[in-house]
Amino acid sequence: MSLDLDQVVADAQTAFASVEDNASLENEKARFLGKSGVLTDLLKGLGKLDPQTRKSEGARINLAKSRVEAALNDRRQALADALMNARLAAEAIDVTLPGRDVAEGSLHPVMNTWERVAQIFGSIGFDVADGPEIETDWMNFTALNNPDNHPARSMQDTFYIDGRDSDDKLLLLRTHTSPMQVRYARMHVEKYKHLDRIPPIKVIAPGRTYRVDSDATHSPMFHQVEGLWIADNISFADLKGVYTDFLRKFFESDDIQVRFRPSYFPFTEPSAEIDMAFGNGRWLEISGSGQVHPTVVRNMGLDPERYIGFAFGSGLERLTMLRYGINDLRLFFEGDVRFLRQFA
């Protein structure tokens, strides 16, 4: 045990520093730290020493071993850095070369319709509002004058969610975007409640909606746009004028025929289905509409004796299908690039 451990460490450091590749470094490692290496042999010989000497010599040898391992790791890192620098130098990028053009994508046809509808109504002063897709039963149905026994509230038509909100109200996936009209109107009323007269409420609410339905013309998830205009002097004539003008702009034609067919919706009174003529005497439903029911106006925080207005709701997929002559709603959700490229 008279071996100079400082000299062993110095020899190892010199040996490691002299190698130029990992294979040579592993050979030098074996000479000092391998099964028959210098330091390994010294550790094996500790068993021949008396306990007191074994303890002190073991500490010295382990310290030397730690220093050798540190030198080994330093050299490994240096070789790795040198290899990386060599690769970077060999693969240097000429930053003066022109870059690759970013491939242009395109909007989905339904999103094109979404933006087109928002632009058309925005041009005549309508705000665009967005709201939660998980709604309360009260906001989705009760606030809109849907009675408790209305079939739309059944689990056969509506996706209900386990749990309740902080006010212990049932939660569901909204079946239309009309709840956002109520939310927007209530915020509008709160904002201007200090005034004697609430400014007109003009808003559309496009978004995803959900119903338990799936076939060639229905999907469990679909897009709707709901519109609302409430003031103190809005009539059914305003509804006819606004929506007919929208259809002319959307279909880019002044030569369109529109009819308002009496119907029933719990949230409007009177109510009407809006149909549009599409050749050969065919009339196709475009939208539901009507004068906002007094109960709904009241739930918006307004006095129905002072304020009146109209509302409408249109399916964005349906508008898209009619504009482009698409017969199967499911094509929008299959992700077939051959289909989608036609609208790029």
Swiss-Prot record:
Catalytic activity: tRNA(Phe) + L-phenylalanine + ATP = L-phenylalanyl-tRNA(Phe) + AMP + diphosphate + H(+)
Keywords on record: Aminoacyl-tRNA synthetase, ATP-binding, Cytoplasm, Ligase, Magnesium, Metal-binding, Nucleotide-binding, Protein biosynthesis
InterPro entries, per the entry: aa-tRNA-synth_II, aa-tRNA-synth_II/BPL/LPL, Phe-tRNA-synth_IIc_asu, Phe-tRNA_ligase_II_N, Phe_tRNA_ligase_alpha1_bac, Phenylalanyl-tRNA_Synthase, tRNA-bd_arm
Class in the EC hierarchy, top level: ligase
Enzyme Commission code(s) on record: 6.1.1.20
Domain of life (superkingdom): Bacteria
PROSITE patterns referenced in this protein's UniProt entry, alphabetically: AA_TRNA_LIGASE_II
Keyword Magnesium applies: yes
Binding positions for Mg(2+) per the UniProt entry: E269
A GO MF label: ATP binding
Signal peptide: none
Cofactor binding: number and manner: Binds 2 magnesium ions per tetramer.
GO cellular component: cytoplasm
Reported cofactor(s): Mg(2+)
Cell compartments where the protein resides: Cytoplasm
Main location: cytoplasm
Biological processes, Gene Ontology terms: phenylalanyl-tRNA aminoacylation
PANTHER family recorded: PHENYLALANINE--TRNA LIGASE, MITOCHONDRIAL, PHENYLALANYL-TRNA SYNTHETASE
Quaternary structure and interacting proteins, as annotated: Tetramer of two alpha and two beta subunits.
Family: Belongs to the class-II aminoacyl-tRNA synthetase family. Phe-tRNA synthetase alpha subunit type 1 subfamily.
Name of the protein in its database record: Phenylalanine--tRNA ligase alpha subunit
Species the sequence originates in: Ralstonia nicotianae (strain ATCC BAA-1114 / GMI1000)
Organism ancestry: Bacteria, Pseudomonadati, Pseudomonadota, Betaproteobacteria, Burkholderiales
